[in-house]
Regions:
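Signature of N-terminal electron-transfer/Fe-S-associated modules in redox systems
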Residues: 1-166, 185
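Beta-strand segments within the central parallel beta-sheet cores of soluble alpha/beta enzyme folds
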Residues: 45-48, 129-136, 235, 394-400, ...
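Conserved beta-alpha junction segments in alpha/beta enzyme cores
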Residues: 328-388
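Gly/Pro-rich active-site capping loops and adjacent beta-alpha segments
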Residues: 65, 70-106, 278-301, 321-322, ...
Length: 426
């Protein structure tokens, strides 16, 4: 296999075959595998070496592809999940994963398989503790790890559990996951795994401040200086309502902020073009003038009225009120022999899925197609329609495989931004 790009040639073995790439030696190996070689079985979650989804084997050792520079591959023997199955037949390790249902959402599965394989290569009959240690660098949000550990132990012959026989049909019968095999082969398609070959890329510019006003200069000069940069989208480019939200009557989250940001990371502009060009333009190049304001850092300060409202449409910073009452609670309380009062609060809980929020959009005539990682395609359709100012039946949402969601992908993230870009640029 040989890929010609722009820099010096890097030669190595990939899944048993000679491979030669002409990449920048500091390019992430995860990008080389996914973008240049088309091996999207290696997943990218955190891009920082925390989640382990991108685990591959380099000379038999576990390595995070997102932290490994392409230049480090020179002369190495590299293995990815695509190399486990032979002639389309699952390896014993993959078969054990399938039998135990160890691949659930599937986003961590390639990393888990490679981590397990690295152990089995040197320790064919490991102990449970050794299996757990070998898998320790790969996070899983779905399984609780038990099925994964059991699958590795069975593949090694160390331990085997008696499982009910698979059945073709019948309520209550055990059957294997219908989408288990693609997840084990690394062929399941998630939001970041595919896009048309001629797609443009988007990079969103986000606020570095939790609260601020800002002025975004005219982008014409930046576009002139960067030929591969097609467009810089701002709030003025939103054809419909520049707001969305999960409440039907409240659409207060701007697609792109107008002149004020209300949280760190709020989108203020979107750069559209080829990948190299949009990555070359830094946030500082845009010349955004920021005026930081006092941030609301707790609900107490938000309700005290000493800081201006986050949204002018929400008086006293209250989004919604809840009320629940049934029966004569007061008299029952007074008649109770034992009374207790207290105040309780819970911490913020992150859904913690590893799958990235990603997708692509294409305008076809007067309709928009949006391929995206989502749990709620119909909610996405309605949100995108009102952002574009078109009818819902002009929007088609094509859900990708979802690498974890747990309710965290009920609301929109990249959907409005992709939709506006595709609709404007056609």
């Amino acid at each position: 296999m040989e890929v010609e790009t722009a820099s010096g040639t890097i030669r190595f073995k990939l899944n048993g075959q000679a491979c030669s790439i002409a990449s920048n030696p500091v390019t992430r190996t995860s990008d080389v595998l996914r973008e240049e070689l088309g091996l999207t079985g290696t997943k990218v979650g955190c891009d920082a070496g925390d989640c382990g989804a991108c685990t591959i084997l380099i000379d038999g050792e576990q390595r995070f592809a997102c932290l490994t520079a392409a230049g480090q591959l020179e002369g190495c023997d590299v293995h990815t999940v695509e190399g486990l199955a032979k002639d389309g037949k699952l390896s014993p390790l993959q078969q054990a994963f399938h039998r135990y249902g160890a691949a659930q959402c599937g986003i961590c599965t390639p990393g888990m398989l490679m981590a397990a394989q690295s152990l089995l290569n040197v320790k064919p009959n490991p102990s449970r503790e050794e299996v757990e240690d070998a898998l320790g660098g790969v996070l899983c949000r779905c399984t609780g790890y038990s099925k994964i550990v059991a699958a590795v132990l069975e593949a090694s012959g160390t331990e085997t559990q008696e499982l009910p026989a698979d059945a073709d049909s019948g309520f209550g019968s055990r059957t294997r996951k219908v989408d288990g095999e693609p997840k084990l082969l690394g062929t399941e398609i998630y939001g970041a795994d595919t896009a048309p070959d001629d797609s443009l890329w988007m990079r969103v510019v986000r606020s570095p401040h939790p609260r601020a006003t800002f002025v975004l200069p005219s982008p014409e000069k930046i576009i002139e200086e960067n030929p591969g940069l097609m467009r810089i989208l701002t709030w003025q480019d939103v054809p419909g309502n520049n707001g969305f939200g999960i409440y039907p009557h409240i659409k207060d989250q701007p697609v792109l902020a107008k002149d004020q940001v209300r949280y760190r990371g709020e989108a203020v502009a979107a750069l559209i073009g080829d990948r190299k060009s949009i990555e070359a333009v830094t946030d500082d190049d845009l010349g955004i003038e920021w005026v930081p304001e006092d941030a609301i850092e707790s609900y107490e300060s938000a309700l005290e009225g000493k800081i201006s409202p986050v949204q002018e449409i929400h008086e006293n910073n209250l989004l919604a009120r809840g009320f629940l009452k049934k029966g004569d609670a007061e008299s029952v309380y007074e008649q109770s022999i034992i009374k207790a009062q207290g105040s309780w609060e819970t911490s913020y809980v992150e859904h913690a899925y590893i799958d990235t929020e990603a997708g692509y959009a294409v305008k076809r005539g007067q309709r928009l197609e949006l391929f995206v990682s989502t749990q709620t395609p119909y909610m996405d359709r309605d949100e995108v329609a009102q952002v574009l100012g078109i009818a819902p039946d002009q929007v088609r949402i094509i859900p990708s495989a979802v690498g974890g969601g747990f309710g965290g992908k009920l609301d929109c993230s990249v959907q409005p931004l992709l939709a506006v870009a595709a609709w404007i640029l056609e």
